[in-house]
C-alpha cells in the first residue's frame, strides 16, 4: 500500500503505527497476494493524494469500493476514465446535478475534477475483493477512516459533509464543528434515490454555503472525455 506523503500525515500519521493498522496491513497484503483486490494497491489512498487535508472543502462519504474491473481507483463513487459503464448510484448523482444546477450528464464517471477542488471522496472501507461487496468490512479500515473524519472535523474553516444513506449518517455524532454544514439525504442507489435524494439540491446548497462564507464554489460539472 502506498503511503500518504502530504499534510494528512500530520493529523493521522500515528494511525500507521497502531496495532490495529499493523493487523489491517498484514490482512490486506495477504489478500492482494492471494486474490484480486480493488482498487490497485497504489490507488488505495488516492483520495488523500488528490485532496490534501488543508484543501478539504467537501466530504462525500461512501461505503466500500466498487468491486468490478476498471471501476475503483480510490475515490468514492468515482470510476476509472476507461470505464464507460457509469454505476447506477453515480448515474443518479448526475441526474440530481442536472436537475439542481443544470449540469449536462457526461460520458464518464471519473470524479478527479472534484477531488482536485477539495472534495474528499472517502469510502469508510478502502479495499474489497473482486465481485464480493463488503468483503473487507470489519478489518480495521473503519477505524482508520474514522480518524480521517475526525481530522476533517477539527479543521477551523467552512466544510460541507454530504451524507447519503444511513451508514454515512451514522458518522454524524463525530461531526461537532459549528463552522461545518451537514447535509443528509437517502443514498443515490436506485433502491433509495426516490425517497429524497432526488430533489435534495445538495450541490447548490453546498455552493450557497461557500458563497455566503466568501469561498470559491465547487464546479460540479464533469467534462466529457
Curated annotation (Swiss-Prot):
It is an enzyme of class 3 (hydrolase). GO terms for biological process: base-excision repair, AP site formation via deaminated base removal. Pfam families: UDG. Keywords: Cytoplasm, DNA damage, DNA repair, Hydrolase. It is found in: Cytoplasm. Gene3D superfamilies: Uracil-DNA glycosylase-like domain. Coiled coil: none annotated. Its EC number is 3.2.2.27. It catalyses: Hydrolyzes single-stranded DNA or mismatched double-stranded DNA and polynucleotides, releasing free uracil. One of its GO terms (cellular component) is cytoplasm. InterPro entries: UDG_fam1 (IPR002043), Ura-DNA_Glyclase_AS (IPR018085), Uracil-DNA_glycosylase-like (IPR005122), Uracil-DNA_glycosylase-like_sf (IPR036895). It comes from the Bacteria. The active site is at 64 (proton acceptor). GO terms for molecular function: uracil DNA N-glycosylase activity. The keyword DNA damage applies. Its main location: cytoplasm. PANTHER family: URACIL-DNA GLYCOSYLASE. Excises uracil residues from the DNA which can arise as a result of misincorporation of dUMP residues by DNA polymerase or due to deamination of cytosine. Belongs to the uracil-DNA glycosylase (UDG) superfamily. UNG family. This is Uracil-DNA glycosylase. It comes from Lachnoclostridium phytofermentans (strain ATCC 700394 / DSM 18823 / ISDg) (Clostridium phytofermentans).
Amino acid at each position: 500500500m502506498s503511503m500518504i506523503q502530504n499534510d494528512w500525515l500530520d493529523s493521522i500519521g500515528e494511525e500507521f503505527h497502531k496495532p490495529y493498522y499493523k493487523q489491517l496491513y498484514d490482512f490486506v497484503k495477504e489478500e492482494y497476494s492471494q486474490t484480486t483486490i480493488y482498487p490497485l494497491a497504489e490507488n488505495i489512498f488516492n483520495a488523500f493524494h488528490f485532496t490534501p487535508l488543508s484543501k478539504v472543502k467537501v466530504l462525500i462519504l461512501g461505503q466500500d469500493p466498487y468491486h468490478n474491473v476498471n471501476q475503483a481507483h480510490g475515490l468514492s463513487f468515482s470510476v476509472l476514465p476507461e470505464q464507460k459503464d457509469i454505476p447506477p448510484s453515480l448515474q443518479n448523482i448526475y441526474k440530481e446535478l442536472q436537475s439542481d444546477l443544470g449540469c449536462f450528464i457526461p460520458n464518464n464517471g471519473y470524479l478527479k475534477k472534484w477531488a482536485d477542488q477539495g472534495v474528499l471522496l472517502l469510502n469508510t472501507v478502502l479495499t474489497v475483493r473482486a465481485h464480493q461487496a463488503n468483503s473487507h468490512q470489519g478489518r480495521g479500515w473503519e477505524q482508520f477512516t474514522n480518524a480521517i473524519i475526525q481530522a476533517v472535523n477539527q479543521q477551523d474553516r467552512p466544510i460541507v459533509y454530504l451524507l447519503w444513506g444511513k451508514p454515512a449518517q451514522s458518522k454524524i455524532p463525530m461531526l461537532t464543528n459549528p463552522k461545518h454544514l451537514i447535509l443528509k439525504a437517502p443514498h443515490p442507489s436506485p433502491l433509495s434515490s426516490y425517497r429524497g435524494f432526488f430533489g435534495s439540491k445538495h450541490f447548490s446548497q453546498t455552493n450557497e454555503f461557500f458563497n455566503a462564507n466568501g469561498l470559491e464554489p465547487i464546479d460540479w460539472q464533469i467534462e466529457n472525455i
